[in-house]
Regions:
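Short, cationic low-complexity segments
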Residues: 25-59, 121-129
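Acidic/polar-rich alpha-helix caps and helix-coil junctions
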Residues: 1-25, 61-303
Length: 303
């Protein structure tokens, strides 16, 4: 835990003879399918989408391209074997949070080494070329925070609510009650931290140290006045920040539902993503998909 945690699921390893029974099991299937790294390897699920990665591209001012990010696809190694020569994009400016969230070829996968690309991907055809990175412990933490040196059985608590999320909720509220500058203040607190925080580095001490940046990182706060902007524009700015900051933390789908934009957003997403992910052809999201089915066991108990 740290000062940002508001509510988290507490886990542990190697306590009271429990082994990994109390460990963080929720993400054991989402560790990379990495046969050359048996201490790291998992099933390779929870892959970030092309659309999410594209969303981290920024303009010349380091601001998100909310309405146009999908017009330019960030360079990726889809359909390229790890044995084939390939270099990551070092020119397109991206928000530095990208490489703390997404594992991609040519960028340090925390301290596990450079991500090799397709060799660590379960099936690029089904889900693309990326691995999740947000819920991966460091290799140098294995002895302390993992069971039997197995990274996926670890003592990393799962944050259900953290302070950044509270700030962004507050920004949403300020937009709705007509205080746009206060909303900007809250959003800029998040963006300033991203600007002042550490960037993923190359070199012997990767991803930390003083080596060269692993990409052309650029991020800045909003400096224009939010007063006078329409609520539609303000909502887009706050919501986009929530997507970037809270990516892969399990909130975005439910945010889309509560904002009442799930059908519009997800159907546009399908149109973009199916260029690479063929099983999405013909997929349609409608209002009946917004809510989970009630389990039969719960229905039976309600009589």
């Amino acid at each position: 835990n740290n000062a940002e945690v508001v509510w988290s699921n507490q886990v542990a390893v190697n306590v009271a003879g429990a082994g990994y029974d109390r460990s963080q099991r929720g993400f054991d299937l989402s560790y990379p399918n990495a046969p050359d790294q048996p201490n790291l390897s998992g099933a390779g699920f929870q892959q970030p989408t092309f659309d999410l990665v594209n969303a981290y591209q920024v303009d010349e001012n380091g601001l998100p391209m909310i309405d146009t990010y999908a017009d330019h696809e960030f360079k990726n190694d889809q359909d390229i074997e790890s044995s084939e020569a390939w270099e990551p994009d070092m020119e397109t400016p991206v928000d530095p949070r990208l490489d703390w969230v997404v594992g991609r070829r040519g960028v340090p996968y925390h301290d596990w080494g450079l991500h090799p690309g397709k060799a660590w991907i379960r099936d690029q055809v089904s889900a693309g070329p990326y691995n999740q990175k947000k819920w991966i412990i460091l290799e140098n933490q294995l002895a302390t925070y993992a069971y039997d040196n197995t990274a996926k059985f670890n003592a990393m608590n799962f944050n259900i609510i953290r302070y950044a999320q509270v700030l962004l909720w507050a920004a949403e509220c300020e937009v709705e009650v007509g205080n746009p500058e206060k909303a900007k203040e809250y959003v800029n607190m998040i963006r300033q931290r991203a600007k002042d925080g550490s960037y993923v580095r190359l070199g012997d001490e990767a991803p930390f140290g003083n080596g060269p940046a692993a990409a052309n990182y650029k991020v800045d706060i909003y400096k224009d006045s939010w007063a006078g902007l329409s609520k539609d524009v303000l909502r887009k700015r706050v919501r986009f920040e929530e997507r970037l900051e809270l990516a892969l933390e399990g909130h975005f789908f439910f945010d889309l539902v509560r904002w009442d934009i799930a059908e519009d957003f997800l159907n546009k997403y399908v149109e973009r993503e199916k260029r690479h992910i063929q099983y999405l052809n013909g997929a349609v999201f409608d209002k009946n998909h917004r809510y989970y089915a009630i389990p039969l066991t719960e229905i039976d108990r309600s009589y």
